[in-house]
Curated annotation (Swiss-Prot):
Function as written in the Swiss-Prot or TrEMBL entry: Transfers an acetyl group from acetyl-CoA to L-homoserine, forming acetyl-L-homoserine.
Organism, scientific name: Cereibacter sphaeroides (strain ATCC 17025 / ATH 2.4.3)
BP term (GO), one: L-methionine biosynthetic process from homoserine via O-succinyl-L-homoserine and cystathionine
The name this protein goes by in its record: Homoserine O-acetyltransferase
Main localization category: cytoplasm
A GO CC term assigned to this protein in UniProt: cytoplasm
EC number, UniProt record: 2.3.1.31
Gene name, Swiss-Prot/TrEMBL: metAA
């Protein structure tokens, strides 16, 4: 089954060209199927790139997906055209009375700030509390996952002495988890962050279970069954060239940055990078969507009751 997107959303043409099944809302309405309603609370500056990345992953599953784009109500983005935001995004205050089978809360490049210093922190706290009554399963990504684990459990983030940047080996530490069906024991995941969550502090918080971890960059994927949530601190959703774009940007701006580790062949930035995480990215998000499908109420209004 396809993902439902407006025909004018850039992701529609991108995914169609890649062979992902996409349909318009008008066509979806003619099918006698209840699609899974998945929201994307997009906090990233490059909105369109992030839309494409997550739509690609959840659109590759066998289920029909109704993909809804959500923004913070008062925060004004500076990197995406206002026309795009007006055409495709709805503010949280407009959707907060609706129910969702799943919600993805993305990262944001504001790691250097304390959570309380983020201009939209109060509304984001409202969003996170709202997920407990209006969303069946929530997936917090990178800063979004750190924000959720801090909000619900008080586990803090910590600044790193140097940016964790590159493709790092990770271990599958919970192979029986339904979210890790098909996962190898050892694989790489793109990492790009200045902060970390510490394993001992996660272990001390009741109800948290680490599923993926790295000897070099720490815990990666954490399950929070009590809040029906997953938190991932690294970037399975990244395109093949996302780390390259970040590296080239910082080099162009004269910022000190190391070559992303284990990313370019022979660690040579003149060579095209290789994508070694794509299959596991599809597995993780496909497993998440499948778990939602298996457990969400058929009547979406029953979510949270």
């Amino acid at each position: 089954m396809p993902i439902t997107l407006p025909a004018t959303l850039p992701a529609f043409d991108v995914l169609t060209h890649e062979g992902v099944m996409v349909m318009t809302p008008e066509r979806a309405a003619r099918q006698d199927i209840r699609p899974l309603r998945i929201g994307l609370l997009n906090l990233m500056p490059k909105k369109i790139q992030t839309e494409n990345q997550f739509a690609r992953l959840i659109g590759a599953t066998p289920l029909q997906i109704d993909f809804q784009l959500i923004r913070m109500t008062e925060h004004q983005t500076k990197n995406t055209a206002a026309e795009h935001m007006a055409a495709f995004y709805r503010p949280f205050q407009e959707v907060k009375h609706e129910k969702f089978d799943g919600l993805i809360i993305t990262g944001a490049p504001i790691e250097h700030l304390d959570f309380s210093e983020v201009t939209y922190w109060d509304e984001l706290c409202e969003v996170m509390d709202w997920t407990q009554t209006h969303v069946h399963s929530t997936f917090g990504v990178c800063w979004g996952g750190m924000a959720m684990i801090y909000h619900f459990h008080g586990v803090p983030k910590h600044m790193l002495a140097a940016k964790a940047f590159g493709c790092f080996r990770h271990r599958n530490v919970a192979p029986v988890s339904p979210y890790l069906r098909g996962f190898s024991d050892d694989f790489v995941i793109p990492v790009s962050r200045w902060t970390e969550m510490r394993q001992d502090e996660i272990d001390a918080a009741p109800g948290l279970r680490t599923l993926l971890a790295s000897d070099e960059v720490g815990p990666c994927l954490v399950e929070d069954a009590g809040h029906r949530a997953l938190y991932i601190f690294n970037h399975f959703e990244y395109d093949s060239d996302t780390l390259k774009q970040e590296y080239d940007r910082d080099i162009g701006n004269g910022k000190p940055i190391n070559v992303p580790r284990n990313y370019y062949p022979d660690d040579d930035p003149t060579k095209p990078p290789l994508n070694r995480w794509r299959s596991h990215a599809h597995l993780l998000y496909g497993n998440w969507i499948n778990e939602i499908y298996q457990s969400t109420p058929y009547d979406i209004q029953q979510i949270g009751r």
